[in-house]
Amino acid sequence: MSAPAVHTLYFEDLRVGMRETLMRTVMDEDVIGFARISGDDNPIHLSERYAATTRFGQRIAHGLYTASLISAVLGTQLPGPGAVYRSQTLNFHAPVKIGDVVTVVVEVVELVPEGRQARLHCEALVDGKVVLDGEAEVSVPARPREGPREGPREGPREGPREGPREA
């Protein structure tokens, strides 16, 4: 079994308005795994009994688990491989529960040639309601001057995308 081909979008390929979408169903294993990796074992994420006594009434996913789905889009789709985070703002509007289907939308809103920076609006939605939003700034690699060109792949588009990608 071979690894999938890596498709890189270089800074020169990006345009304001390009967007990419990812869908992910939050599974119990995701929340448990995130707790293990992050060390955040707050019982609101892991204990049904404890979570039932909170204002949410049930377990919720870690906010940064939801935010990590933004990172997945930035690192694999838009801009994709080679993009490096510079900053990320996050505003949490509502909890994400186990079983929720999260749709993450990332859109290029500004390109800064000096330093090959891209600013992207990011949001996560559940049932059409924004549960998290913010902005990311990333550095994007320049197209190599010589050698074979691997570039742009089908994927990020301007405007709405038909059917989000399932993770």
Labelled PLM ranges:
Residues 1-16, 96-167:
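HotDog/MaoC-like acyl-thioester-processing domains
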Residues 44-46, 56-57, 84-85, 90-91, ...:
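Short, intrinsically disordered/low-complexity patches at protein termini
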Residues 16-18, 22, 30, 40-42, ...:
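A generic structural signal for short beta-strands and their flanking turns/coil linkers
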